[in-house]
């Protein structure tokens, strides 16, 4: 007597599963002349309420027919051609339906966004926002608010950069931190924020880098160690900006935004900037420079009123994205050390508690609106005058700046042109950076503000202004 065992996926009490058919045909073809019958054990294994059970397995005897199938074994049933064209069993990936992280987290997050498309905005391209890789420079009040809103839009790649540690005053204003994060000197903000995002939503890929960003007016030439560290920090920042699609500037001081603004302008990355006052804020997108091969014939110093790109009658209407100004374009002085003569209480950002959440949310919504526009960062800027016109995207306007005044509960949408003497995005600064790299940056860090002013022509502008006044 011959007994064979077969793993049986069927749960019926009196019948085996269909895979047994293939084996019975093979047995009849190979041993039909020698055996009249075989005993078959259909082994069934299941776990119910933590207890393993095989008592529902069945055993029975099968009579084998004589050799009546011919010399060739018939084709097996239940197999289909796979992606490579070969015959094999059809496999179905049920991980999304069985994995609680995917089922309850990713599917639910995606469902909320898809409902927007199905019910309200059918032309919304979610992939553009979900696939955006976002770099957050600053993990404080603004950084926490921006990160949470990015997750709401389904963004899967978020990276933090910050050099501070969590203090006892932070958790009440910065929602990614808890009281325990302040103990033992405080955890690094960037690392703690990245870890908290993973706990909030396991599907997000978040990283944190505890590092400083070199700044104009903050010398780094005290020793070879400080110079080497500055070079290392610059190289890391360049690498991070290069590997991300959108850069958020969310730091405390003005000068800390200069270096990432220069690097991002050189690498043609979309920059979203947010800054706070006590009851005012500004959220803006930096002008996105044209690709280098298309820049011939264009310069920031060209007369905007005579440009063929400006189709409107107003000087500030229909300005394309590559002619928009950056955070420093309205300055007539170079950035410097803004904390040198300030007391400790003056060095802290003091603003109304709800302001950061408003500005952070608008920063993310501005990013999404820009990405939804067919021209992306090169989209023509919308102004306050366009509020009654047909919006350029399914989500509405795509402004250059949003300036808010909480005391009046009012927002305005100004537009400003790129400044040919800008200390961050002008052609002279970008050319020097691209040609000399860190050597140029070191001069900016270690020199007074006059270095950038002399380079860009601001010093001459000051002299001409004084001469005109006289």
Language model features with spans:
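Generic beta-strand/beta-sheet core signal
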Residues: 137, 153, 161-164, 209, ...
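Secondary-structure transition/capping motifs at alpha-helix termini
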Residues: 156-158, 200-204, 267-270, 322
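Glycine-rich phosphate/adenylate-binding loop
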Residues: 1-107, 133, 216, 224-470
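Glycine-rich adenosine-cofactor-binding loop
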Residues: 122-167
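Glycine-rich dinucleotide-binding loop and its adjacent helix/turn
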Residues: 105-128
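Glycine-rich phosphate-binding loop and adjoining beta1-alpha1-beta2 segment
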Residues: 161-214
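Immunoglobulin-superfamily Ig-like beta-sandwich domains in protein ectodomains
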Residues: 112, 116, 166-168, 215-222
